[in-house]
Amino acid sequence: MKPSGAFLSLCVVLLSLATHCFSFPSDSLRRDAHSDTNALKSRDRRQAPAPQLSCGGVLYNPAAEMCCHGNVEPRVGASPMCCESSSYDPSTQMCCEGTVSNKPPGIAMCCGSEAYDANSQICCNGNINTKATGPTAQPGCCGEFSYDAASQLCCDSHPVLMVGSLPSCCGRNGYDANTSLCCGDNNVAFVSGPQAACCGDMGYNRNTHLCCDSNVLPMPAMGACCGSWTYSQQTHLCCEGVQLYKGMNTGCCGAVGYNQVNSLCCEGTVVPKSPSKPVCCGTTSYNPLTELCCDGIAFFKTGFIRPTCCGGAIYDATVARCCDGVPTYNVASCAGLA
């Protein structure tokens, strides 16, 4: 009995299914092997240690850390930088003289080791101050202080308010130079006018007062100063700071009064005056007709044809020469004399 056509067809289908279930194509095997190899390599990469560098003798991971002047610091922000031995994030922080500060709003600047906002603050000699504001403000520094040059003066590195029509400084004080004087280093004297003047630290009117050794005193008639006091030149003399009653012929000889008719004042010494000795020679009186005064010493002219002074001595110029202040005899000239 021969198999039918339907039976043969069924056998072919069954044989085809069996072949498909138990066959392994070579290209599929190659793909699976390649996938396994890549997975192993990826795992090996994840497990490999990160490269390390040295910073001051200490190893660090450059992916998470950075070396700042020999100090290992963490990386902060997207573009970290070093501030001396510290790391910082320049997008939110500032490095001011080696110190990390949070960046302020506005125009961020450094004032010494601190950060400040230049829109609202001002740095004066390393000190952060509030900046002067207003439509007419002229902000600036006065020493270590902030001031407004439109309404203030800077007096001795200190801000003071402007006063009057001619504001000026008197030490650390402000004053109106049209109505006051600055006397001494910092004293404001409230005097004015063409006769206003200073007497030490005080102001005074020169029409009514005198300044005697920094003392302001009422002015007497024909008044003048004698030391620290006033006196009347009508009735008194002032002899080197000493007041003396004024006589008809009284004069001063140092701090002493003397009669100018019968006395002489010779180099601060009162000596008798006579018709024979009417003038001074040093601290004594002498007669210029009969005597010669040489360096404060009186010599008689007797015996000299042409009496002449040579230093502190007298000599006869007809028989000698004066060589270097010494009378020298029997020489034609002083040349060659030692």
UniProtKB/Swiss-Prot annotation:
Residues 1-23 form the signal peptide. Residues 30-50 are annotated as: Disordered. The keyword Secreted applies. Residues 30-47 have a biased composition (Basic and acidic residues). Keywords: Secreted, Signal. Component of the acid-insoluble organic matrix of the aragonitic skeleton (at protein level). Initially, expressed in an aboral submarginal ring and then along calcifying septa. It is found in: Secreted. Pfam families: Galaxin_repeat. InterPro entries: Galaxin-like (IPR055284), Galaxin_dom (IPR056601). The keyword Oxidoreductase does not apply. GO terms for cellular component: extracellular region. This is Galaxin. It comes from Acropora millepora (Staghorn coral).
